Structure formats: structure tokens, C-alpha cells
Amino acid sequence: KNWYNGYRGLQTLRQSLVQSINVNAVKTLEDIGIEKSKEYLKRFGLINEENELDDTYVSRSESVDYNDENLSSMALGAMTRGITNLKMTGAYAAIANDGKYLEPISFTKVVDSTGKVILEPEQKQREVTSKENAFIMRDILKGVPDAMAQGAKHPTIEVSGKTGTTSDIRDSWFVGFTPYYTIGTWIGFDNQNIELSNNNSMAATLWGKVNKIVLEGKPAKKFDPPSENIIKKYVSIRSGLLMPEGSGGGIYEYFVKGTEPTKYEELYYIIYQIDKRNGKLANTTTKDKYIENKKYYIKPEAYKKGKTDYAQEDFVNPPPTEVSEIIDSDNSQNPNDDNNSNNNSNNNNNNNEE
């Protein structure tokens, strides 16, 4: 179940992350598999099999009844024993650091009164994903402060991050980063019976206040631009396939070279002139103020319903076939005349996307 009521139709993974769409997170995990996901959790420091005292992940071998090896826990978070803010922040820092994970440390060095270094811990690091993948994730997460977490925005420095809440808003998270630092905030109680207020953006607001203090005096800065191994393509928001640039229903999206789509979407659309007063096709007497130009997407084959009756509205609601019977007085032409401007055979607004 998503946090919102209703159905929003087909959503890209970018939209799903920005809008916290739970269903698509679960579907993605289902596609890649539990074992593959576990490998990435290990890489990002969220599972530590070498140190049981530092590992909060519960495997199926540890507990058959209560474990984290399921679609709910691994896709949506809020694991059986939870995850510490330190670990979560360390994982996000790897995205900020071009895919390189730096093991969190509490100090950089200890010196005596003469400046001699007494202690200087070695900070372990490893590559957990490519810098190209890290760039795309940074770019996607830049959309969150513009949508769900506006309290985290900074006036001159770019911010990427992600909100997080648990059932009944018992926990509120925001973990994010700038070109300078990665910060994690969590608001909640040790007693899980205590609920927070309905303001699920409170952690983002707190994060924004802390971030502004930390960045005080820092010059304006944006994230590094994409490398030459990143390309941008205009793709359909419905299928993810290529579309002609400038046609409706598409967005520009980044891809790692070699992973971009090569086929064009087979959907096409027709623009119909609709009489806003009754939802029927406008006739030759319909005044401009009553006309709405409405785009209908047509699929090569009929939409097939799944387990529910939910479907993308464009796919199941075909354009109207009846002509409006309302005749506007300053034009006496028969609205059902063969020369009606909405006759499909004469429609000049077809835009085939091949």
C-alpha cells in the first residue's frame, strides 16, 4: 500500500523514488531478488557479517518467523531491529562520493600539545557502485527536496536526499547530502507505542536547519556534471522507450552508455476537440471557450486488466464517439455534418510515435 489514497497510474522509477511510491519499490526488489539486494546492503555497510555486535540485520537462518529477508523489510526499510542513523548516513555518503563507501569514523586524529599525532585511524574504503550509477542516483534524489522535503532545500547549494516514515509515523527520517557533507536525521522514540505528529516532513525540516549551520560561509556549489559515459535521452513516461524530441508525454532521462533504450514507443496519441460542457466531441458550432483539446493515448492492443480494476486512465478510457448536441446560436450548421472538425478521418492532429 502507498502512503496516499487512490491510483496514479504508470510511474517511472525516478517518480517512484521522489514520491515515495512503495509498490514500485517492492516490485523492483522482486525483479532483482533478495540475494542480489543483500549483496548491495553488505557493500553499503548496512549488513556487517564480520561483526555480529555491529549487525542489526536479521537473516532467515537467525529467525524463521521474524527476519528481514522479505519484500516488505528490504524494499521499504524499518527492519526487524532497525538500522542506525550512522549506518544509513554512511550508505548515502557512498552515493555522494561517486560510489565509494568510506567506513564512518568518529575522529580523524588525536594530537598532543606539541602537535605530534598520537592516534590516526585508517578509514577503510571500497567501491560499491560505479560513479555513473552514483551520479544518476544523486540526480534522482535532487527531486526530493523540490517535492516531498522542501524544508531541506538550501538557497545556494544543491541538496539530494530521501525522506522516510514508518507505519503510524512512529519514525521520521531524512538522509541527504550536498557537494560538501552527508547528514542524517531521525526523529522518534525508543518506545514504539508513541506516535509522532502527522507532519511527516519534520525530519527534513530539522535536516535543513542543521545543514544551513554546517554550511555557513561555504560558497555556492552544485554537484559535478555527468561524465562522458552518461547520456541523456528523451523517453516516454509510460514505457521508458524512446520518443521523438518535442512530442508530448516524455521526459529527458540520464542513462549509462549502453543501457539506454534503442526502440521507440509503439503508443501514439490523437488530440480531440472536446465540448467541456458534456464531454462529447465538439461540433462545428461549438465556441472556442467551450472547447478543450484533449490528448488520448492509443495502444496497439486493448488494455489487459490484472488482479485489480486499476489501470492507467489513458489506456481504458477511449475518446468519445458521440458529437455534442449543443448548438451555439451564432452558427446554424448541423453538428452531425460530415465535415465535422472532429471526424477521425480528417483529424490533422495525429502524432505517430514510431
For each predicted feature, which ranges?
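Ser/Thr/Gly/Pro-rich low-complexity, disordered linker/stalk segments of secreted
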Residues: 324-354
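Conserved catalytic neighborhood of penicillin-recognizing serine enzymes
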Residues: 1-37, 71, 113-138, 142-143
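Short coil/turn segments at secondary-structure boundaries
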Residues: 29-32, 39-44, 52-56, 103-108, ...
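A penicillin-recognizing enzyme superfamily signal
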Residues: 15, 82-267
